[in-house]
A protein has these predicted regions:
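Surface-exposed patches in mature extracellular/periplasmic domains of secreted proteins
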Residues: 22-31, 91-97, 149-154, 180-184, ...
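Short acidic, glycine/serine/threonine-rich helix-capping segments at coil-helix boundaries
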Residues: 318-323, 331-375
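An acidic, Gly/Ser/Thr/Pro-rich helix-cap/linker signature
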Residues: 1-87
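Flexible, glycine-rich surface segments
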Residues: 149, 153-161, 166-284, 310-311
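Secretory-pathway/luminal and periplasmic proteins that interact with or process carbohydrate-rich
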Residues: 36-43, 103-113, 124-128, 144-150, ...
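Acidic/His-rich structured neighborhood in mature extracellular/periplasmic domains
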Residues: 54-201, 212
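Acidic, Ser/Thr/Pro/Gly-enriched interdomain connector segments
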Residues: 276-289, 297-342, 381-390
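Acidic helix-start/capping segments at beta-turn-to-alpha-helix junctions
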Residues: 27-51, 99-103, 113-116, 215-223, ...
Length: 390
């Protein structure tokens, strides 16, 4: 049976698409028979019960098999990859790392119908503007004939192709690298990687020759850890504060005059990095510190670099209940006034820094499982999910 709410959304969306210059009969035909995808709704609304430490994600991403696979692709595909690298001044290793992360070198592009996925997200309403704008982009691709509906397969969130472009990014940045007259990010690896390079340069402002991140160590005991995740500074200023590269050769020359932020994804006991503007360029592709670090570290290993000097600390996963209880504790203690949602974002990290400083702890903002238990004990909160969140 038709979903009345979805049908109301469909009618309103068709009117919006027509107002943006699309033909009503074409839009109606493409959307005919489209119904909400329960699978997409479930994935969009689900928050994992347990959050693995970032170390688990990065160790999985920067695996020996993926490093070797990337090196093999760079060697085998240099005839078409080298011209892309030269034209866009983006390293082959970065492009191939993104290719590996997004689709296992084109093998796993997702099989969800992009039109249906975006229609589902738009009608659900939580990300209506984003989903409707991207859906109009998908309609433009289909109406222009650049792709057919059976090609528009991708992730449940609407990303598609070998390097997982959204429809609007496809329209703006996809290129025809192999010269066959089509911007085929699904079937043509040269088109997909050239499109990614074009995106990194034009939208994300990739800086040639510069690093994405450099592993560093804090050389002084009295370091001010509130500087973690703070404003970027010149490497010389970081060095004056005791933050220096773990590589005894120091920073590569192109990085020496470039401001960088200090990040410690698992706190002061784990690896530390100077994150340069190219780290943020990767985050423009996928706005996740973990993703950008994984791409940068994977690229470094493909280029012959060694593993991290500072190992990741052993830390057990935290549950949604743990994280919500930590936010409740920070609220009760007067450090946090944001939403209790289990998402430990910048607001929670700032609050955690204040609490850590009050306890004489390194104020890096990272809440390990052990620290969450200590925080809860102090505030008298427990790891129970409020009824409103279940």
């Amino acid at each position: 049976l038709p979903d009345p709410a979805f049908e109301a959304w469909r009618a309103g969306f068709i009117a919006k698409a027509v107002a943006q210059g699309l033909a009503e009969d074409q839009v109606t035909a493409i959307l005919a028979g489209v119904q909400p995808d329960p699978h997409v709704l479930e994935l969009d609304q689900r928050q994992p019960e347990f959050s693995k430490p970032i170390s688990s994600y990065i160790n999985g991403a920067v695996s020996a098999g993926r490093i070797a696979g990337g090196q093999a692709r760079i060697a085998a595909d240099h005839l078409w990859l080298d011209p892309i690298v030269n034209r866009y001044q983006t390293p082959a290793e970065i492009l191939v790392a993104i290719w590996a992360m997004e689709s296992a070198f084109g093998q796993l592009q997702g099989d969800d119908d992009v039109v249906r996925s975006l229609a589902t997200l738009a009608a659900e309403g939580r990300r209506k503007t984003f989903a409707e704008d991207e859906l109009i982009g998908a309609l433009r691709i289909l109406i222009s004939g650049e792709a057919v509906r059976t090609q528009l397969k991708g992730s449940w969130a609407g990303a598609m192709g070998q390097t997982q472009f959204t429809p609007l990014d496809y329209l703006a940045y996809a290129v025809d690298e192999d010269g066959d007259g089509r911007r085929d990010i699904w079937g043509s690896a040269p088109d997909a990687l050239a499109s990614t390079a074009n995106f990194l340069v034009k939208k994300a402002h990739w800086r040639p020759e510069q690093s994405a991140q450099i592993e560093v160590a804090v050389q002084i005991k009295a370091f001010d850890y509130t500087l973690v995740d703070g404003p970027a500074k010149a490497p010389a200023d970081w060095a004056a504060l005791g933050v220096t590269p773990v590589d005894p050769r120091g920073l590569p020359d192109p990085d020496k005059g470039v401001d960088a932020a200090l990040i410690m994804p698992m706190g002061w006991q784990g690896p530390a990095f100077l994150a340069f503007p190219n780290h943020m360029a990767i985050r423009a592709y996928n706005n996740s510190v973990a993703y950008a670090l994984a791409v940068g570290l994977l690229a470094d290993r493909m280029a012959g670099g060694g593993p991290l000097v500072q190992p990741w600390p052993a830390d057990q996963p935290t549950s949604l209940a743990d994280r919500m209880a930590a936010q409740q504790a920070l609220t009760r203690l007067g450090y946090y006034s944001g939403e209790v949602d289990g998402l430990l974002g910048s607001g929670t990290r700032k609050a955690a820094k204040l609490w850590q400083a009050s306890q004489g702890l390194p104020a890096d903002g990272y809440l390990s499982y052990a620290l969450i238990q200590r925080l809860n004990a102090q505030a008298g909160t427990a790891a129970t999910i409020p009824a409103a969140a279940t």
